[in-house]
């Protein structure tokens, strides 16, 4: 039996984590446009190149220091060592806020991928994140996505 890798999906509230989760797993996790929408973790599976992955959608958190029950759930899972990799989803329009969590996780996980989501909305606001440069600075793979339309998710699956 092949090994199933566990991938945590982390990020600030309201950055599209559940939309990314739904697109990758094919499930229908309820999504909403308000912080605190996901209050417990959800799990789903997907396969890529013959490998099976368990994707864990965590509640939104701003850092590993918990200030709410939702952040406690996310922080406990992220610090438990259960994840083989972490995808940190950030809002393309508000990178600074999301990078705090990404930098904290970068220090404690060997496999981190930064998913710069909501690229379509950022473009409408005239914001164009330098994703290639960001990847060089952080020394992690960076994937630009617009999860609602599915743009960039094939590349995210490969990472």
Question: Residue spans of the language-model regions?
Answer:
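Conserved nucleotide-binding/hydrolysis micro-motifs of P-loop NTPases
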Residues: 36, 60-63, 92-96, 118-123, ...
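Conserved C-terminal guanine-recognition region of P-loop GTPase G domains, centered on the G4
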Residues: 44-50, 73-143
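Glycine-rich, highly charged phosphate/nucleotide-binding loops
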Residues: 66-73
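Hydrophobic residues at beta-strand termini and immediately following loops
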Residues: 39, 143-145
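Conserved G1/Walker A P-loop phosphate-binding module
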Residues: 1-66, 80-81, 85
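Conserved GTPase G-domain signal focused on the G5
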Residues: 16-17, 148-159
């Amino acid at each position: 039996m092949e090994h199933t890798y566990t991938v945590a999906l982390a990020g600030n509230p309201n950055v599209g984590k559940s939309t990314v989760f739904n697109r990758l797993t094919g499930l229908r996790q309820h999504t909403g446009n308000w912080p605190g929408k996901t209050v417990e973790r959800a799990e789903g599976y997907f396969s890529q190149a013959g490998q099976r992955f368990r994707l864990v959608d965590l509640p939104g958190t701003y850092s590993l220091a918990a200030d709410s029950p939702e952040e406690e759930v996310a922080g406990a899972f992220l610090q438990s060592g259960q994840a083989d990799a972490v995808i940190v989803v950030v809002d393309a329009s508000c990178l600074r806020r999301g990078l705090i969590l990404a930098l904290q996780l970068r220090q404690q996980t060997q496999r981190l991928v930064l998913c710069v989501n909501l690229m379509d909305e950022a473009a409408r606001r005239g914001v164009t994140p330098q994703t290639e440069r960001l990847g060089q600075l952080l020394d992690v793979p960076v994937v630009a996505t617009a999860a609602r339309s599915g743009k960039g998710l094939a590349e995210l699956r490969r990472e």
